[in-house]
Curated annotation (Swiss-Prot):
Stretches the record annotates as Flexible linker: 170-178
UniProt record similarity statement: Belongs to the KaiA family.
Keywords: Biological rhythms
Function comment: Key component of the KaiABC oscillator complex, which constitutes the main circadian regulator in cyanobacteria. Complex composition changes during the circadian cycle to control KaiC phosphorylation. KaiA stimulates KaiC autophosphorylation, while KaiB sequesters KaiA, leading to KaiC autodephosphorylation. KaiA binding to the KaiC CII domain during the subjective day yields KaiA(2-4):KaiC(6) complexes which stimulate KaiC autophosphorylation. Component of the oscillator and circadian clock in this organism, enhances fitness in a rhythmic environment. Stimulates KaiC1 to autophosphorylate, has no effect on the kinase activity of KaiC2 or KaiC3.
InterPro entries named in the record: CheY-like_superfamily (IPR011006), Circadian_clock_KaiA (IPR011648), Circadian_clock_KaiA_N (IPR020844), Circadian_clock_protein_KaiA_C (IPR020856), KaiA/RbsU_helical_domain_sf (IPR017944)
Comment on protein domains: The N-terminal pseudoreceiver domain (PsR, approximately equal to KaiA N-terminal) binds oxidized quinones. The KaiA C-terminal domain mediates interaction with KaiC, homodimerization, and is responsible for the clock oscillation function.
KaiA N-terminal domain segment(s): 1-169
Region described as PsR domain, binds oxidized quinones: 1-135
Effect of deleting the gene: A triple kaiA-kaiB1-kaiC1 deletion grows normally under photoautotrophic conditions in continuous light. In a light/dark regime has strongly restricted viability and impaired growth behavior, and overall decreased pigments (after 5-6 days); phenotype is more extreme when grown on 0.2% glucose.
Designated name of the protein: Circadian clock oscillator protein KaiA
Protein source organism: Synechocystis sp. (strain ATCC 27184 / PCC 6803 / Kazusa)
Domain spans labelled KaiA C-terminal: 179-287
Alphabetical GO biological process terms: circadian rhythm
Domain of life of the organism encoding this protein: Bacteria
Amino acid sequence: MQSPLSLCLFAPEHVAHRLRSIFQGDRHYLSTFQALDDFCAFLEDKPERIDCLLVYYEANSLPVLNRLYEQGRLLPIILLEPSPSALAKTTDEHPTIVYHNAEIHLPESQWSELPTVVDRAIAHYLHLGPICTLPNQTETIPAPIVDESSQSFLLLQQRRLADKLKERLGYLGVYYKRKPSHFYRNFSPQEKQEYLEDLSSQYREIILSYFSDEGTVNDLLDQFVNQAFFADLAISQILEIHMELMDEFSQHLKLEGRSEEVLLDYRLVLIDILAHLGEMYRRSIPREDIPFDVYYQTD
């Protein structure tokens, strides 16, 4: 089971109530704060345990973010922007809130996408350098303390979150990590023959154990699907393997004087394998909301 992401929210209660409904489930653990002192105390206690900050865009948020920046305590963050009318009033009266170059500003109209945006915020955070500058830095924000402890904090956080993000992404990105030299279409004629013979042997074993109670068929299915996936094998090749084996079994049944109807049940094997393969492709193609190179950084 994946460990949940620990999110820390500083926002008014009406915003917190809305976000609790968005982060239902066991993929995220949301800690909410309305009082600035409580929020600061939580951040200073165990900042390394926080996976992402969610901060409502208002003047009250500025002091604590300035303090974190000055201390070199940089964390993934999403700034929740209120409606345009409320935001206009805020920016007219207060300085712009900036924390670091990897922060994400999310308008209220897109708050429903927060579970996905959290992953993106963490992915952006992984690219922060030890010396992080602010865009359009104002004179009211002193330069950060760049010492060994702050650099160590950033690097340790990035390493921890990279592992956590990789755990959550699973097979995502594997699609583009496959080696063309391992693709079936690039095999030599002899390699193709040996590969298909091996795959056909595996398929036979799956069929013979599919309706047994030994509990090994899932491992056999996974092994077969993995080989087909990384060889970029065409579905037509799998269908051909299935039909050849069914023809072979049909001949045996005829010689024994038995009905061929039993072979119809083995269509379930083909459906199961194609479903597994389709799911692997679905899970492996990178999501558009995650920067492409993060799939390689989390290796």
